[in-house]
């Protein structure tokens, strides 16, 4: 699909969805998986927030922050992948609150026993379950969707079984075939399904920036 047509398709053909919870993103949090689905980093890059429906949610992410070393040197600290589950049934906004991470000692403590909080719009703590996502794959590139699915099937602390099977059939990301003028090849269908899903979750400003970028791309 040509980029211009894709932008028009996203802007005009997506169904209107009513969301009730805003997840405020942090530049120190690298979001990897949301509710069992791999995050589209290209679409959400620079986004300040994404919109969620009320109900249970699960995030897989890493904390990334520059820390100080002896001798006034610095390095980028990247935490192990973390899983956090929570419920937004009566919550309109979710904000990350990270602990102090300024040096190697604090980073080591966080690696061993990660702790952080999610706050609502009134800065009140949201009940959460937090865990480390143990990676079972030996591949150089980790498929966090698969690792999250395995985690959710293992009855761990932050597991949400309802998200364990959602990636088995990506057709659930596409509400109806009638939304498309024609049915594209399967590989293209999967790509569009994922793009539509993350476009719908992005905040209005991010959608606007993405459409501007898409219009500037040369036809494929």
From Swiss-Prot:
Keywords of the record: Signal
Extent of the signal sequence: 1-20
UniProt family annotation: Belongs to the UPF0319 family.
Pfam families referenced in this protein's UniProt entry, alphabetically: DUF2057
Protein name (database record): UPF0319 protein YccT
Keyword Endoplasmic reticulum recorded: no
InterPro entries: UPF0319
Keyword Signal recorded: yes
Protein origin, superkingdom: Bacteria
